[in-house]
């Protein structure tokens, strides 16, 4: 009986050990949230879009993540721009955003994550502005881990590539 009680307590603690104040810095590279559950392998019910397919170095592009249906909400995210394995550029979170915050994954503001919010404040759509480094050229993809709830999450979902052009 005591064993069952201990298992129940440990399970409850695991369920509350998700990261309500944002992704841990340890998730910056692999983008795995550490929920003690396996990520979903089927395609995510979310899209990652940009209004343009190319931008000059030093310029910005809006990146939008949307659930495909109203039920496809987000409890948490970790969003980065990647060129190969490198996290590049900086993000701007809209003023007054009650869902998101910039994150330091080696450089200030080079990722976006969620912050503490009530379940009723889960989002179906979020948008952020990404600014390319002025000296960057080549393709970049926007990579996101999306958490719908503790046991339903998709890791390292990618956008179509955006070409970064020489700013000269």
Curated annotation (Swiss-Prot):
Signal peptide limits: 1-18
Residue runs in coiled coils: none
GO cellular component: extracellular region; membrane
CDD domains: Reeler
Induction behaviour: By bacteria (E.coli and M.luteus).
Localization annotation: Secreted
Free-text tissue specificity from the UniProt record: Very highly expressed in midgut, and highly expressed in fat body, silk gland and epidermis.
Source species, domain of life: Eukaryota
InterPro entries xrefs: Ferric-chelate_Red/DefProt (IPR051237), Reeler_dom (IPR002861), Reeler_sf (IPR042307)
Family: Belongs to the insect defense protein family.
Function: As this protein is expressed upon bacterial infection, it may have antimicrobial activity.
Protein name (database record): Putative defense protein 1
Record organism: Antheraea mylitta
Phylogenetic classification of the source organism: Eukaryota, Metazoa, Ecdysozoa, Arthropoda, Hexapoda
